[in-house]
Amino acid sequence: MLQPGNYSLVLSLQFLLLLFDLFVNSFSELLRDPPVNQLVLFILQDVGILFAAIVLFLMLFNTFVFQAGLVSLLCQRFQVTVILCAVYIALSISLHVWLMNLRWTGANRFVWSDGLLALFVLQRFVAVLYFYYYKRTALSMGDSRFYHDSLWLRKEFARVRG
């Protein structure tokens, strides 16, 4: 079970990962002069997003609800967050690969095509949704109902079985 001291540590880690992701999204265009700098930032950002998703899944798997077999309840409750995690990592990797492909050969020339600009805007829009839902899910995972047997859980179990 997740203890209160451990929860605050995990929550701090999750917020730190979100803050780093926000930093890279905000300032990666300013740090592009040698392309290798931007490449390292993009790799660290993608690894951070994957690590944040792993931490989120570990928190979901650690709940009493999951251990009681009500996986469908967790999936229903946090479905949007899980889908946004997958979409956001796919958009981020796509944008990073496209940008690095264009910038590696000519770092000082204009590389913004219409498709790249559309992908950039879409990735930034999904990033806002991802940040909101991820933070909301991370904070709601602190609810004590998820970590011990309760009347709410028994009612949900009866509803699923009946």
Curated annotation (Swiss-Prot):
Keywords: Cell projection, Cilium, Cilium biogenesis/degradation, Glycoprotein, Membrane, Transmembrane, Transmembrane helix, Vacuole
Main subcellular location of this protein, as a coarse class: membrane
Record field: transmembrane: 7-27, 41-61, 80-100, 110-130
InterPro entries: TM_138
Pfam family name, one: TMEM138
GO CC terms: cilium; vacuolar membrane
Subcellular compartments: Vacuole membrane; Cell projection, Cilium
Topological type in the membrane: Multi-pass membrane protein
Residues glycosylated per entry: N6
One annotated GO biological process: cilium assembly
Coiled coil: none
Signal peptide: none
Role description: Required for ciliogenesis.
Family per record: Belongs to the TMEM138 family.
Protein name: Transmembrane protein 138
